[in-house]
Regions:
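N-terminal nucleotide/polyanion-binding subdomain common to many enzyme families
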Residues: 1-91
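Short Gly/Thr/Asp-enriched flexible loops that form oxyanion-binding sites at enzyme active sites
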Residues: 119, 168-177
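Conserved beta-alpha
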Residues: 71-154
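A transmembrane-helix-recognition feature enriched in membrane-embedded lipid enzymes
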Residues: 71-76, 200-251
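Proline-aspartate-enriched helix->loop->beta-strand connector
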Residues: 150-164, 180
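A short helix->loop->beta-strand "cap" motif at the edges of active sites that frequently abuts
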Residues: 33, 103, 178-182
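Short, flexible loop segments at boundaries between secondary-structure elements
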Residues: 132-138, 179-217
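Short glycine-rich anion-binding loops that position phosphate/pyrophosphate groups of nucleotides
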Residues: 40-44, 162-167, 189-190
């Protein structure tokens, strides 16, 4: 039984990245499709505003907190928080420690020219890969093609690397289509692991500053997310603290 901590309407798995990777790896490849989500501050704010999107996250088999900032703010607010297990860390652990010799993974998203470096860096067998077109989630035929690819290319690990909320919508549709395996909604994690995009230094990650590293590299795209939208998680945490009525011991 996976321990959970309820936070902002989601039952988060209270696992380290190592424990989360082991739990994911323990699922048989032929099991009915289930998916993992990795909400960060931006996701949690959007979920509070969009009940339909929140339902997709609640439908995930495993919900992992992807934000040390949210964890720290939650503790300051007196709200119990789960352990942090970032999507990038869990993905790296799966590729490095939980693949069988010659085992192939399925990837939906990620640029095709990044695949050789990803495979070379991590000793992967050639992945089964589908790169849907931009805006595929608004094109019924393209969306259906992505779902069909997941069904036609079963794997123990199916990495959905098309960004939130597209990957969560896709994961729910793949589950409804009767696929098998475990889907991982992991955003840019594979791009980091392929060396196509640099990840923040370890000390910045440990101090909850990965967002600042990414903002400095791409301010035009990320300024609104990190400076305007994500801070809205603070009143959500304070509201949760008030609803619970008393301080909870943080981790």
């Amino acid at each position: 039984m996976i321990p959970t901590v309820s936070l902002l309407g989601l039952d988060f798995a209270d696992l380290t990245a190592e424990q989360a990777a082991a739990a994911i790896a323990a699922r048989p490849g032929g099991a009915p499709f289930a998916y993992t989500v990795t909400p960060n501050a931006d996701h949690l704010v959007r979920l509070a505003r969009d009940p339909a999107l929140a339902a997709l996250y609640r439908g995930a088999w495993l919900k992992l907190l992807d934000s040390r900032v949210v964890a720290g703010l939650g503790r300051l607010a007196g709200v119990k928080v789960p352990r942090v297990a970032t999507g990038s860390d869990v993905t790296a652990l799966l590729l490095r420690h939980h693949l069988r010799p010659g085992e192939r993974v399925t990837i939906i998203g990620l640029r095709p020219d990044w695949l050789p470096e990803l495979a070379a860096r991590h000793g992967l067998a050639p992945p089964m890969h589908h790169d849907p077109p931009m805006g595929f989630d608004r094109d019924p035929a393209a969306f259906a093609a992505a779902v069909a690819f997941a069904r036609a290319h079963p794997a123990r690990f199916i990495f959905l690397a098309v960004g939130s909320p597209r990957q969560e919508r896709l994961a729910a549709a793949i589950a409804a289509a009767g696929a098998t395996g475990t889907g991982l909604c992991i955003g840019a994690s594979l791009a980091f692991l392929a060396g196509a995009e640099p990840r923040a230094p370890l000390w910045m990650r440990h101090h909850g500053l990965e967002w600042a590293f990414r903002l400095a590299r791409d301010p035009r795209r990320l300024a609104r997310r990190y400076l305007l939208d994500s801070p809205c998680v603070v009143p959500l945490l304070l509201r949760e603290r008030a609803a619970r009525g008393r301080p909870a011991a943080g981790r």
